């Protein structure tokens, strides 16, 4: 389990996302 805050955040790359979230193919962190 990754430490990923459950917020809807648009992204283009993993580093755009907080915590251990990754940028998913739908364009949002998850």
Swiss-Prot record:
Gene3D superfamilies attached to this UniProt entry: 4.10.75.20
InterPro entries recorded: Prot_inh_squash, Proteinase_amylase_inhib_sf
Site residues, Reactive bond: 6-7
Annotated PROSITE patterns: SQUASH_INHIBITOR (PS00286)
SS bond partners: 4-21, 11-23, 17-29
Gene Ontology cellular component terms for the protein in this record: extracellular region
Subcellular locations according to the entry: Secreted
A Pfam family matched in the record: Squash
Keyword DNA repair: no
Alphabetic keyword roster: Disulfide bond, Knottin, Protease inhibitor, Pyrrolidone carboxylic acid, Secreted, Serine protease inhibitor
Modified residues (Pyrrolidone carboxylic acid): 1
A biological-process GO annotation: negative regulation of serine-type endopeptidase activity
GO molecular function: serine-type endopeptidase inhibitor activity
Protein task: Inhibits trypsin; probably participates in a plant defense mechanism.
Record family assignment: Belongs to the protease inhibitor I7 (squash-type serine protease inhibitor) family.
Free-text domain note: The presence of a 'disulfide through disulfide knot' structurally defines this protein as a knottin.
Protein name in UniProt: Trypsin inhibitor 3
Organism expressing this protein natively: Momordica cochinchinensis (Spiny bitter cucumber)
Lineage: Eukaryota, Viridiplantae, Streptophyta, Embryophyta, Tracheophyta
């Amino acid at each position: 389990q990754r430490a990923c805050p459950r917020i809807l955040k648009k992204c283009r790359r993993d580093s755009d996302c907080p915590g251990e979230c990754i940028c998913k193919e739908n364009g949002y962190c998850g």
